[in-house]
């Protein structure tokens, strides 16, 4: 049954060819967010997976991870903490850099956003090369969190990110996958 629900989500995601550059197919979750039934199904897939786990917080990766992460935290009666792009948080922060195709980027969190030993679920919308998610995992661990699992709506396994994440020992859950050429 979960497969049917995941397939509904997958069918609702819009594929935009040649955006933002030629040869890239962008996976757009906004149709999922616009349709209350499908958005509810998406959130329920995550809720049913995590409702019996002993979690303390949900962390969401900037920016679309905020949408799903905050709603999921609310549904699970947990706190939510943002993992932001560099220079977006007003208080004391700690950062983790990661490599991009043409340079570096960084994610940040407030130094007081998690406590040592807290069990955290990390959420984002999509995993491609895995750089942002890996940096967020490292950042949470540096702050003392136990990253129970990383989760995303979409996995693009042919880009290698999901394999890199699981290679760290962090379990990974994704609602749907797209293979190259899908």
UniProtKB/Swiss-Prot annotation:
Entry EC no(s): 2.4.2.7
Pathway named in the protein's UniProt entry: Purine metabolism; AMP biosynthesis via salvage pathway; AMP from adenine: step 1/1
Entry superkingdom: Bacteria
Recorded catalytic activity of this chain's protein: AMP + diphosphate = 5-phospho-alpha-D-ribose 1-diphosphate + adenine
Key word Cytoplasm present: yes
GO cellular component term of the entry, any: cytoplasm
A Pfam family this chain is assigned to: Pribosyltran
Keyword Thylakoid: no
Subcellular location: Cytoplasm
Single GO BP term: adenine salvage
Annotated keywords: Cytoplasm, Glycosyltransferase, Purine salvage, Transferase
Location, primary (coarse class): cytoplasm
Family annotation (InterPro entries): Ade_phspho_trans (IPR005764), PRibTrfase_dom (IPR000836), PRTase-like (IPR029057), UPRTase/APRTase (IPR050054)
Single GO term (MF): adenine binding
UniProt subunit comment: Homodimer.
Role summary: Catalyzes a salvage reaction resulting in the formation of AMP, that is energically less costly than de novo synthesis.
HAMAP family tied to this protein: Aden_phosphoribosyltr (MF_00004)
Similarity remark: Belongs to the purine/pyrimidine phosphoribosyltransferase family.
Name of protein: Adenine phosphoribosyltransferase
Source species of the chain: Bordetella pertussis (strain Tohama I / ATCC BAA-589 / NCTC 13251)
